[in-house]
């Protein structure tokens, strides 16, 4: 099967797309990744054919962010349709926030599937609005709270649907969006929440992780716990997390004696690194085999990767979906949430998680939930076969 996988350049979306391409290739399929120019060489080094996704640079200044997103997706669909036509894939897999891939597939009459590299974020009649971080309300007052919040957000959701319909018509598609054949929900079941209206096309397939390097960070010597700090790669992530951790987490003072600190990041400004710490880009999968605790911003990729390794968390969420993810971690029991990230709050949360076995036990329970997921490649093959 020849498949085109479309994702924007944000690592939280491009890396899962590369991971899915590798899964396709391992199964004997022929994947081609369309993504930002900054990850083309990385994908090719991993053995994946890759091409630049056209139209990623914004060209309008519409003050309505929602309208701008939909208009940009439609423009990108038209720009990228010729490259997809030349590739002639049997299937297109489009990242959930890169709607252009699905629209381009529709323009060409190619079946398409959506990749959600996080839990399902569609609104539900049984949940508070996604992003609130709230658990479903219980009792009359709790259900009333959720209903009121859903009503307050429904107007924006309906406006988005109207904007999407308008730009679809502009590029020659029907106003009504038929949606994807399947939605690949690439998360751990432990991070999902039950809903009464789970879509029939949505399938849990487990996290999709890709390591952009095979370099191994050398952990400083010591007999105490290893604390990993993984600052967010998202534009909405909390700033200064690494700096606060390096300045205030000190072995024998605010950490157990012999502790080590490892800051794992793709890049950033130079930092003053004490002798008990190391900073750089290294394989997080390898690093997590040594970790006793991870401090991160709450992006789904790092949270899921950490839980898969059975390691507990201290989450310092920024914007976007990080608040939602952080609260799900807390409710699942595998970590603590702090906001704002004051030095005192960070030190207290780190020491509580390190000293209490229940956090690691919950993380291991989350890791075990992977046993119930489906194979994303098989899901794609079976969905395509049903189209005849």
Give names to the regions the model predicted:
Residues 194-269:
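Conserved catalytic-core segment of nucleotide-activated headgroup transferases in glycan assembly
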Residues 71-143, 190-192:
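Conserved nucleotide-sugar donor-interacting segment of glycosyltransferase catalytic cores
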């Amino acid at each position: 099967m020849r498949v085109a996988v479309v994702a924007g350049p944000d690592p939280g979306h491009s890396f899962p797309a590369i991971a899915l391409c590798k899964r396709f290739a391992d199964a004997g399929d022929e994947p081609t990744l369309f993504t930002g120019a900054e990850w083309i060489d990385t994908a090719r080094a991993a053995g994946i054919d890759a091409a630049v996704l056209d139209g990623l640079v914004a060209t309008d200044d519409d003050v309505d962010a929602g309208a701008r997103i939909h208009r940009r997706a439609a423009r990108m669909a038209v720009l990228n349709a010729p490259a997809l036509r030349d590739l002639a894939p049997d299937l297109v897999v489009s990242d959930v926030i890169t709607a252009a891939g699905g629209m381009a597939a529709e323009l060409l009459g190619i079946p398409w599937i959506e990749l959600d590299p996080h839990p399902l974020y569609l609104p539900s009649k049984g949940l508070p609005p996604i992003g609130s971080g709230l658990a479903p309300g219980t009792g009359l007052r709790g259900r009333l709270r959720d209903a009121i919040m859903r009503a307050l957000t429904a107007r924006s959701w309906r406006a988005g649907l109207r904007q999407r319909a308008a730009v679809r018509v502009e590029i020659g598609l029907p106003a009504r969006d038929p949606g994807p054949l399947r939605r690949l929900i690439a998360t751990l079941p432990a991070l999902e929440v039950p809903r009464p209206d789970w879509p029939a096309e949505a399938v849990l397939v487990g996290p999709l992780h890709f390591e952009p390097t095979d370099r191994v960070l050398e952990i400083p010597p010591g007999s105490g716990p290893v604390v990993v700090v993984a600052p967010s790669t998202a534009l909405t992530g909390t700033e200064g997390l690494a700096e606060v951790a390096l300045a205030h987490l000190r072995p024998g003072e605010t950490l157990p004696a012999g502790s080590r600190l490892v800051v794992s990041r793709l890049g950033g400004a130079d930092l003053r690194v004490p002798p008990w710490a190391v900073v750089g880009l290294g394989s997080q999968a390898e690093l997590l085999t040594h970790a006793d605790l991870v401090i991160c911003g709450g992006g789904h990729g790092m949270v899921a990767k950490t839980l898969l390794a059975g390691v507990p968390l201290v989450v310092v969420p920024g914007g976007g979906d990080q608040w939602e993810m952080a609260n799900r971690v807390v409710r699942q029991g595998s970590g603590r949430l702090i906001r704002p990230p004051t030095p005192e709050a960070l030190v207290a949360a780190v020491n509580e998680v390190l000293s209490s076995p229940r956090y690691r036990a919950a993380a291991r329970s989350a890791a075990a939930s992977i046993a119930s997921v489906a194979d994303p490649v098989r899901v794609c093959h079976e969905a395509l076969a049903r189209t005849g």
